[in-house]
Amino acid sequence: MIALLILSLTCSVSTYRLQGFTNAGIVAYKNIQDDNIVFSPFGYSFSMFMSLLPASGNTRIELLKTMDLRKRDLGPAFTELISGLAKLKTSKYTYTDLTYQSFVDNTVCIKPLYYQQYHRFGLYRLNFRRDAVNKINSIVERRSGMSNVVDSNMLDNNTLWAIINTIYFKGTWQYPFDITKTRNASFTNKYGTKTVPMMNVVTKLQGNTITIDDEEYDMVRLPYKDANISMYLAIGDNMTHFTDSITAAKLDYWSFQLGNKVYNLKLPKFSIENKRDIKSIAEMMAPSMFNPDNASFKHMTRDPLYIYKMFQNAKIDVDEQGTVAEASTIMVATARSSPEKLEFNTPFVFIIRHDITGFILFMGKVESP
């Protein structure tokens, strides 16, 4: 049997067809148990979706179920996904870049119809036994600006197909934190209390207290300048319960509940980088595509391909000016208002979301900034 490597690299109102796409990434995130987490649900779901297109048999059935799609909805969902990608526009103050590359070994016979339909999305032929790592890194860096996204541990002599998607986001806050007001402050987690650099801003934001099964959480939306992308922050006593409750539909609902308030917001600066093998997570959703005896990608080739590796590398930096995030399966306050104090001095969840499509570009948890 031939093996396939999927590597997802990361550095919304959803249509009903794409809510399953978003939820697949959320479900994957919920299976990560680290303290500090940065993950790209979009990057994960995009890799799974692009694996669905050539899939057949049980592999296609499982991936359709993962995306909560009926067979007849696959074509329209793909059209909506491509349309949604076009809405992730770069502006003067924000930079959003997503690339997709499918590298197929020269020995694999690709069906002409599949090539005709999907080669424009980044289909490359190469010899995986001849300097494939350098060739792939060169192409990915040229298209995305990210360097060294694959190494020799990710590719081997069994690799005949590698799917790589990258997502890079750099955004400037619409209401930046004043760097002169950043002070050391206490942050308390399950390990105790530590001192962290705490940013501070007084401004009008959208926020509210949301209730989930009698548990209350403070949620606030930090918009990025000149873009339809926001970071949503949530804090409460039981953040595990909050995370377990997240779905694409609930994020839509919660975002509509947020109202304008003047906040004195305090948020720690933080930087998180994760490199993880996510094969076991994907295998829970679509096991047959990892099984040499059951995997089927016959819409692309008659060669017996199966997936044997799946990774995601993700990184995020948040400071006074804004956010830099990448993945390699990611108003003025009125003086008459008394600002509502909201300090993120205990573990919290962050979500970077495209508010037009509902795509969750990045999502994570800060346990120890």
Swiss-Prot record:
It is a peripheral membrane protein. CDD domains: serpinO_SPI-3_virus. GO terms for cellular component: extracellular space; host cell plasma membrane; membrane; virion membrane. GO terms for molecular function: serine-type endopeptidase inhibitor activity. It is found in: Virion membrane; Host cell membrane. Prevents cell to cell fusion via its interaction with A56 protein. The A56-K2 complex associates with components of the entry fusion complex (EFC) presumably to avoid superinfection and syncytium formation. Belongs to the serpin family. Orthopoxvirus OPG040 subfamily. Induction: Expressed in the intermediate phase of the viral replicative cycle. Interacts with A56 protein. Residues 1-15 form the signal peptide. SMART domains: SERPIN (SM00093). InterPro entries: Serpin_dom (IPR023796), Serpin_fam (IPR000215), Serpin_sf (IPR036186), Serpin_sf_1 (IPR042178), Serpin_sf_2 (IPR042185). This is Superinfection exclusion protein. Keywords: Host cell membrane, Host membrane, Membrane, Protease inhibitor, Serine protease inhibitor, Signal, Virion.
